[in-house]
Amino acid sequence: MTEGIQNVSQPQIKIENLNLWYGEKQALKNVSMQIPKNSITALIGPSGCGKSTFIRCLNRMNDLINNCRIEGKVSIEGKDIYEPDVDAVELRKNVGMVFQKPNPFPMSIYDNVAYGPRIHGANKKDLDGVVEQALRSAAIWDEVSDRLKSPALSLSGGQQQRLCIARTLAVKPKTILFDEPTSALDPISTLRIEDLTMELKKDYTIVIVTHNMQQAARISDYTGFFLMGELIEFDQTRQIFQNPREKSTEDYITGRFG
């Protein structure tokens, strides 16, 4: 990996020499990165390069995969999340995740958003306010405020994805991971999610996996390029797209492979 950004004054997440294996297959190789607070970091690279595997290390989703082994260090706000005393459920409350395809629960719009706060012991009398605030923050309140008891699955794809973002926001995370959140959406819905993401970075640290080079260039502050399990280059997005240090980075973003 080229030098790029070495020391961030306020890193929300610090990754040091991260390696991951699925059985005998090594999927991540000596990945180190510092993700700044209240920023959008985009992860780009061809399919199978390790991007999604990497972000699942940031909230220990890989714990759920059999035969997965991890070495290295991932610190969030100075705390190593792989220490034995770390509660993975509490970690995932603080590091929320939005997936590639909208995955609302088969329940009402209201109950989708209230689900997480209920699990974490929210006071019943506070739920209405929590739900409204999350839906407003996800820019969907005006579209659903008069039908909160309707099935979430009755919403359009773009609305469902914003509902899933609201569901994530409802438990008040500090970091949000997006794994290709617009790949299943139409261009108009994609633009709304992008606008929302840029608005959310005021209050959250955001890491987004995307195959869309234009999307990464439009919305992110920092970009990391992965190839075959290695972080090839990590820098400010402007630097990556205008003057990459590595030829393989330039080849990828100009469409020579991928």
Swiss-Prot record:
GO MF terms, alphabetically ordered: ATP binding; ATP hydrolysis activity; ATPase-coupled phosphate ion transmembrane transporter activity
Subcellular location: Cell membrane
Domain ABC transporter, first and last residues per copy: 13-253
Keywords: ATP-binding, Cell membrane, Membrane, Nucleotide-binding, Phosphate transport, Translocase, Transport
E.C. no: 7.3.2.1
Sequence positions that bind ATP: G45, P46, S47, G48, C49, G50, K51, S52
Entries under PROSITE patterns matching the protein: ABC_TRANSPORTER_1, ABC_TRANSPORTER_2, PSTB
Record's bilayer topology term: Peripheral membrane protein
Keyword Nucleotide-binding (UniProt): yes
Pfam families: ABC_tran (PF00005)
UniProt keyword annotation of Translocase present: yes
Record Gene3D superfamilies: P-loop containing nucleotide triphosphate hydrolases
InterPro entries: AAA+_ATPase, ABC_transporter-like_ATP-bd, ABC_transporter-like_CS, P-loop_NTPase, PstB-like
A cellular component annotation (GO) from this entry: plasma membrane
SUPFAM superfamilies: P-loop containing nucleoside triphosphate hydrolases
PANTHER family associated with the record: ABC TRANSPORTER I FAMILY MEMBER 17
Summary of the function given for this chain in its UniProt record: Part of the ABC transporter complex PstSACB involved in phosphate import. Responsible for energy coupling to the transport system.
Quaternary structure note: The complex is composed of two ATP-binding proteins (PstB), two transmembrane proteins (PstC and PstA) and a solute-binding protein (PstS).
Family recorded in the similarity comment: Belongs to the ABC transporter superfamily. Phosphate importer (TC 3.A.1.7) family.
The name this protein goes by in its record: Phosphate import ATP-binding protein PstB
